[in-house]
């Protein structure tokens, strides 16, 4: 049986990063995303520049204003975050169907079945992070290990825009020297109880008996005992079977030039074909989505008699759909191409290994 390989991907300061992407004047500034200070709102996300002032998520906005009076305060735009998250989750699903989203900006991926001697889990994580950045302009951090607990722990060790692998050769050193407050799932209240029992590091936790931990923490004690030893048997729970594969891009400036847009549709058709190839799937519906400079979204879909998976076949349909949708007088800022109603491909497509190694 193959040794498990789990990736935990966590987007960096997700809400704030989306705001910086959509408003480049915010880059490098202390950005705080949340509700109004006057309505007892709380901080949803703070950029790393804002965190230097002590601002953190779940903090009352009124307190954030006191700590960082010159910060850039932005009202949360959940539609924008959900849209970015949908693209990110689709990237995950293009690699494996065994994806467990934990929130809009965080998920576990079981890639055990993809790993080969010439294709490591860390290499796959690098490709996933690359795809996220290319398609959304957002950075992410990844943790790679042989269980969920360690993958989650690893993803926070080289933030932002980093990656960490925890394996059998370094797990003991990492866990034994880890501050107890840095263990996933140990919050302020638990940390205080830990300190009351002289537990300050992973080594201190490791030295406690299972009986002691259960007595102090109840049912959680068993889990803490196992985690101190790097043990976690929980599985990545896939949420649903993939029904479509798609790719979209946001233009750096609003565009209404047909040649430029059609070139982008060709690129998106190729990228979608590559994803279908990795999954050995084809689909019998093609959808083109346009978002205008005024943030209005339009889409058009066509059902096909025969499923498609090749770039040229996808492009030919997408070309027609775009011509049906376009308004020469209305610039667009985003375009997407999606293939749906998936089925097992009848073509001799590349495997995921061929694609990744290209």
Swiss-Prot record:
Organism phylogeny: Bacteria, Bacillati, Bacillota, Bacilli, Bacillales
Domain of life: Bacteria
Keywords tagged on the record: Cytoplasm, DNA damage, DNA repair, DNA replication, DNA-binding, DNA-directed DNA polymerase, Magnesium, Metal-binding, Mutator protein, Nucleotidyltransferase, Transferase
Note on cofactor: Binds 2 magnesium ions per subunit.
PANTHER family in the record: DNA POLYMERASE KAPPA (PTHR11076:SF33), DNA REPAIR POLYMERASE UMUC / TRANSFERASE FAMILY MEMBER (PTHR11076)
Annotated site, Substrate discrimination, chain positions: 15
Summary of subunit composition and partner proteins: Monomer.
Subcellular location field: Cytoplasm
Protein name per Swiss-Prot or TrEMBL: DNA polymerase IV
Disulfide-bond pairs as recorded: none
Catalytic activity, reaction form: DNA(n) + a 2'-deoxyribonucleoside 5'-triphosphate = DNA(n+1) + diphosphate
